[in-house]
Amino acid sequence: MINDISDIAYRIEEISDTRITLVRDAVNRTFRNGGLLIRCLRPTLSIDYAFSAAPNDYIRRFLSCPALARLVPELQPMTPLPNDLTIVPLGRYTLEGEIVQLLLANGMYADSEFDVRMAPSAATNFVDALIGDSKSSVHRVDSHWADWFDGIEWNSITLIVYTDRKWWLICAFDTD
């Protein structure tokens, strides 16, 4: 059982599932001065985390690991992370709601392409593509932890999904 994940090597998996790219592309067209960043990172070694024992600790270590800064350099994670980093556990349906909110949100200079009937269906499909029927852990980070967000906490979100030995990192923001 691995307890320290800060020095583990990861690889980014290509995201080609249209249920994911549909949401990513739609939000990117709406959030023109920010965007939606989605990355799937998998450890290069076959390891077993004790994730359920201390998820907040693992998330902090994941967000501050050197591999994340190398693989997703546009994020520019803060080092060290703020001590007051707020990590909130979510359920699957709350994750779907967060995605619905992203799809319905108007950007600073562009309106959403989705309406209240289309967005929930797209969000359900998105979450199905991420986690399917597998056991997963879903969290939202409610604090500024990376410079990519331009210090904007009022119009940004970070969602982290750990499932099937991989990390999904979903970050969005928009500004004027």
What do these predicted ranges mean?
Residues 120-176:
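Acidic, proline/glycine-rich low-complexity IDRs
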Residues 1-114:
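N-terminal "domain-start" segment
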